[in-house]
């Protein structure tokens, strides 16, 4: 579940592809991200090594809400829950009956999930951004400006203005693809979704 800790595509018919200047890319990406104050979806995740060999598959559900709230529940093949209440992140492993709790790192380069739930107004300070459009899909490629990051590049794709998929590539070429399905934006999400009560008797690790 390495990629879940980090976080925190259909082939398209050939069409016109356009590239844009960086400032326009930043403005467009910021607009698309900020347009969705809440998002809920199912996701499927595939992790590949540098040669393209499948390392891991997973699926589950997610919910995010600005500012800084997210819920990521992997239900198969190995259950895991990651919850942020905007101040701290709790990682729950039911198999180990163990909760790991740490302060939320608000740097986008360290917590990619905050692209969907955090403050992206200064996103250009963290990344060099480029974009490509093809039909109803817009792809943004983000490359961190510093070396102290969990990934070398991050691609974020939108279809008809809604998040469609993400791909993270790390320093050894390992790729994690996350495809979102049944995406709903700007619907009410209960506050309880972003609170995690550690089960009685569980091990708790504070980092």
Swiss-Prot record:
Database matches in Pfam families: LolA (PF03548)
GO annotation, biological process: lipoprotein localization to outer membrane; lipoprotein transport
Top-level taxon of the source organism: Bacteria
Location relative to the cell: Periplasm
Signal peptide interval: 1-21
Protein's UniProt keywords contain Protein transport: yes
A GO term from the CC aspect: outer membrane-bounded periplasmic space
Primary role: Participates in the translocation of lipoproteins from the inner membrane to the outer membrane. Only forms a complex with a lipoprotein if the residue after the N-terminal Cys is not an aspartate (The Asp acts as a targeting signal to indicate that the lipoprotein should stay in the inner membrane).
PANTHER family: OUTER-MEMBRANE LIPOPROTEIN CARRIER PROTEIN
Oligomeric form and interacting partners: Monomer.
Cited NCBIfam families: lolA
UniProt record similarity statement: Belongs to the LolA family.
Name this polypeptide is given: Outer-membrane lipoprotein carrier protein
Native source species: Pseudomonas entomophila (strain L48)
């Amino acid at each position: 579940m390495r990629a879940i800790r980090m976080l925190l595509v259909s082939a398209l018919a050939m069409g016109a592809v356009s590239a844009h200047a960086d400032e326009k890319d930043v403005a467009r990406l910021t607009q698309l991200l900020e347009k969705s104050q809440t998002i809920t979806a199912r996701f499927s995740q595939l992790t590949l090594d540098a040669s393209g060999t499948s390392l891991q598959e997973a699926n589950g559900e997610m919910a995010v809400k600005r500012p800084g709230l997210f819920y990521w529940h992997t239900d198969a093949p190995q259950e895991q829950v990651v919850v942020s209440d905007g101040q701290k992140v709790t990682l729950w492993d039911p198999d180990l009956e163990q909760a790991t709790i740490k302060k939320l790192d608000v740097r986008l380069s360290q917590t990619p999930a905050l692209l969907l739930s955090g403050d992206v107004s200064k996103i250009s300070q963290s990344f060099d951004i480029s974009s490509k459009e093809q039909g109803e899909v817009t792809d943004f490629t983000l490359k961190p400006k510093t070396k102290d990051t969990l990934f070398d590049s991050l691609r974020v794709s939108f279809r008809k203005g809604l998040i469609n998929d993400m791909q993270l590539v790390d320093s050894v070429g390992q790729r994690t693809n996350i495809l979102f399905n049944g995406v709903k934006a700007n619907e009410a999400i209960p506050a309880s979704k972003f609170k995690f009560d550690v089960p009685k008797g569980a091990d708790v690790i504070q980092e």
